[in-house]
């Protein structure tokens, strides 16, 4: 079930959060059956994801993601770093769920996303079985800075030199930014830690 849950986080963020508010609403309405991996709901979810993915490939302008804008990487800058920081004990989908939560909160604190929507996003992730905190998030480096923040630099290199992060304007509406305010990232991390208490 870990593998199925991990795949669900990719579905959730790639398709519903950055592209399709109605799909997000459907996920919420069907979350109980999705959490149980009920066949009918899973088939509907997979079909809608495939449709949205095909739309991105055929209409996105960059089907092989050769440029720096990669909307399907929503939640990934921190996820990639968390995976390596935990020696991959944290699975990709689990790390992406945390990344989604951080980026949703960042979107709120930066004034892009309405307050309360980040909580709605987190609640659905948790209902689907994801833990949105890991002690590695607080790991510091030799300079007493958060090791996770280095994930931004790593992600920039992964993108070929230009930092492009997908954030949210609304559920179903993703957009790219080229700069990230570290202090807002730190506030987002603190918020995520406090909501786990």
Residue ranges and their predicted role:
Residues 14-15, 105, 109, 157, ...:
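Amphipathic alpha-helical interaction elements
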């Amino acid at each position: 079930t870990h593998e199925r849950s991990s795949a669900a986080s990719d579905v959730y963020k790639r398709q519903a959060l950055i592209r399709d508010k109605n799909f997000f609403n459907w996920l919420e309405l069907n979350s109980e059956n999705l959490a149980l991996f009920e066949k009918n709901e899973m088939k509907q979810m997979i079909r809608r994801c495939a449709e949205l993915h095909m739309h991105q490939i055929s209409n996105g302008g960059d089907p092989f993601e050769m440029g720096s804008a990669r909307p399907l990487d929503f939640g990934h800058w921190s996820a990639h770093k968390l995976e390596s920081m935990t020696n991959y004990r944290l699975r990709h989908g689990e790390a992406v769920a945390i990344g989604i939560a951080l980026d949703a909160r960042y979107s709120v604190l930066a004034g892009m996303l309405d307050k309360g929507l980040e909580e709605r996003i987190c609640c659905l992730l948790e209902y689907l079985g994801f833990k949105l905190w890991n002690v590695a998030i607080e790991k510091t480096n030799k300079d007493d800075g958060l090791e996770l923040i280095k994930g931004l630099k790593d992600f920039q290199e992964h993108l070929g030199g230009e930092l492009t992060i997908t954030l949210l304007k609304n559920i179903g509406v993703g957009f790219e930014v080229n700069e990230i305010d570290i202090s807002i990232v730190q506030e987002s991390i603190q918020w995520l830690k406090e909501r786990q208490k």
